[in-house]
């Protein structure tokens, strides 16, 4: 019998559960899936910005800065930071021409 359908009945003046052995493979699998789902949901809510940024942009770190002068690199970093600071609730992607 599934844990979802177990029935509580009074037994010897106490409340107890009348259910079959809970080592049923289906019950164990459902419990494991339920626990994993709960853990993944909690992690998703805690790190939703990081998760969605990762899935949207992948592992891209941005354009290559090889051969670009340091002053232009610093200007690009400032633009990126100001874009993130301007609107913290949405992701802003700036691409240089």
Curated annotation (Swiss-Prot):
A GO CC term assigned to this protein in UniProt: membrane
Site (Seems to be involved in pH gating): 41
Record text on activity regulation: The M2 protein from most influenza A strains is inhibited by amantadine and rimantadine, resulting in viral uncoating incapacity. Emergence of amantadine-resistant variants is usually rapid.
A single MF term (Gene Ontology): monoatomic ion channel activity
Site location (Essential for channel activity, possibly by being protonated during channel activation, and by forming the channel gate and the selective filter): 37
Spans within the Intravirion topological domain: 44-97
Biological role stated in the UniProt entry: Forms a proton-selective ion channel that is necessary for the efficient release of the viral genome during virus entry. After attaching to the cell surface, the virion enters the cell by endocytosis. Acidification of the endosome triggers M2 ion channel activity.
Family per similarity comment: Belongs to the influenza viruses matrix protein M2 family.
Protein name: Matrix protein 2
Species whose genome carries this gene: Influenza A virus (strain A/Leningrad/134/1957 H2N2)
Record lineage: Viruses, Riboviria, Orthornavirae, Negarnaviricota, Polyploviricotina
Gene name, Swiss-Prot/TrEMBL: M
């Amino acid at each position: 019998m599934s844990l979802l359908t177990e029935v509580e009945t009074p037994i010897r003046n106490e409340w107890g559960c009348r259910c079959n052995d809970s080592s049923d493979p289906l019950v164990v699998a459902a419990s494991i899936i339920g626990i994993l789902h709960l853990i993944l949901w909690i992690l998703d809510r805690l790190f939703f910005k990081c998760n969605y940024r990762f899935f949207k942009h992948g592992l891209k770190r941005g354009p290559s800065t090889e051969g670009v002068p340091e002053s232009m690199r610093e200007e690009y970093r400032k633009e990126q930071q100001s874009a993130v600071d301007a609107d913290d609730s949405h992701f802003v992607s700036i691409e240089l021409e």
